Amino acid sequence: MKITRLTTYHAAPRWLFLKVETDEGITGWGEPVIEGRARSVEAAVHELAGYVVGKDPARINDLWQTMYRAGFYRGGAILMSAIAGIDQALWDIKGKALGVPVYELLGGLVRDRMKTYRWVGGDRPGAIIQQITDYRALGFDTFKFNGTEEMKLIDSARAVDAAVVKVAEIREAFGNTIDFGIDFHGRVGAPMAKALLRELEPFKPLFVEEPVLAEQAEYYPRLAASTSIPLAAGERMFSRFEFKNVLCAGGIGMVQPDLSHAGGITECVKIAAIAEAYDVGFAPHCPLGPIALAACLHVDFVSHNAVLQEQSIGIHYNEGADLLDYVINKDDFHCVDGSIAALPKPGLGVEIDEDMLKRANENPPDWRNPVWRHSDGSIAEW
């Protein structure tokens, strides 16, 4: 079998899908994208095509290493996202060719179902209590929301209180019947992160995500020493080498690589294994589309330390399409009590409505994250 063609499709709300075709008629799907940089990743995908077209798709490890190492300059968000999407598609092809789900190729199941959580609120979160109430009726008991809006490097007690009051209201409304993670989203500098963690500790969040930016990873062990709240990070880390350094330094209780950013299935299986060696949980980042979610689930199902899976049904970003709109076999992704069962179909187990996707590609989205500014006019972290 040989790879013959790579085709990319843009689709609302902010996704890029990749179709990899072979001379035997088996096709694989991937989702290579950086939110807000889809066209940059698309260009990288087609640049990497020269390494894979004409090659045997079964040699996933060799193709991955070639895409990563053949260029003198390597790594980073764009290139690793392009590799990720191609890698996902190669695993999809291999599973379909052999008639088994990808998790069987990775050694088989360690669990029968994977617990997921729901996003509530938005960039500037509001109506969180009502959303949690609605989702609890659907069987979900674990949630995540943004913890702050803009926050200066050194900010006021008012800014801290605003974040804490919101969390207090949620805990008061639901008691300990729910769990929630709080996403600092890299908006908080190290000095304020320490203050916020101290004030949030009485409300027992499940985790705090991106307490500081990945560029400030040296603060993870210092912050962890000041709180009992597990710290999570990793959506803006793109290889096992970055995770290696963070895990060696300590401080992180849960790693969150993105299967569409951090080299795909091949790389993230390794990241999960390294994290397990450090007794650190694995909870892939995935506010993206169905192929990305399917890839995450296959790694979750073979990773003993997988604890939670993010998924984007109803997320505030999904304007123009929701998670399963381009999926034919929607029932395979159905959540029961907040968990998804092992996907039964060969490959990644997601059947894409290609006709719908082609129509979406005729009017491609141009999503960009908001640009925020502080009251003094300086740019703020979104």
Curated annotation (Swiss-Prot):
Q: Which InterPro entries match?
A: DgoD-like, Enolase-like_C_sf, Enolase-like_N, Enolase_C-like, Galactonate_deHydtase, Mandel_Rmase/mucon_lact_enz_CS, Mandelate_racemase_C, Mandelate_racemase_N_dom
Cofactor dependence is on: Mg(2+)
User: What EC number(s) would the UniProt record show?
Assistant: 4.2.1.6
Where does the record place the site Increases basicity of active site His?
D258
Q: Where is this site: Transition state stabilizer?
A: E310
- Pathway listed: Carbohydrate acid metabolism; D-galactonate degradation; D-glyceraldehyde 3-phosphate and pyruvate from D-galactonate: step 1/3
Give the transmembrane ranges: none
Q: Name one GO molecular function term.
A: galactonate dehydratase activity
Extract the Pfam families matched here.
Answer: MR_MLE_C, MR_MLE_N
Give the residue ranges for region: Disordered: 361-382
**Keyword line:** Lyase, Magnesium, Metal-binding
Query: What residues bind Mg(2+), as annotated?
Result: D183, E209, E235
Q: Where is the signal peptide?
A: none
Active site (record annotation): H185, H285
> What does it do?
Catalyzes the dehydration of D-galactonate to 2-keto-3-deoxy-D-galactonate.
Q: Anything else of interest in the record?
A: Reaction proceeds via an anti dehydration.
How is this protein named in the record?
D-galactonate dehydratase
The species this protein belongs to is: Xanthomonas oryzae pv. oryzae (strain PXO99A)
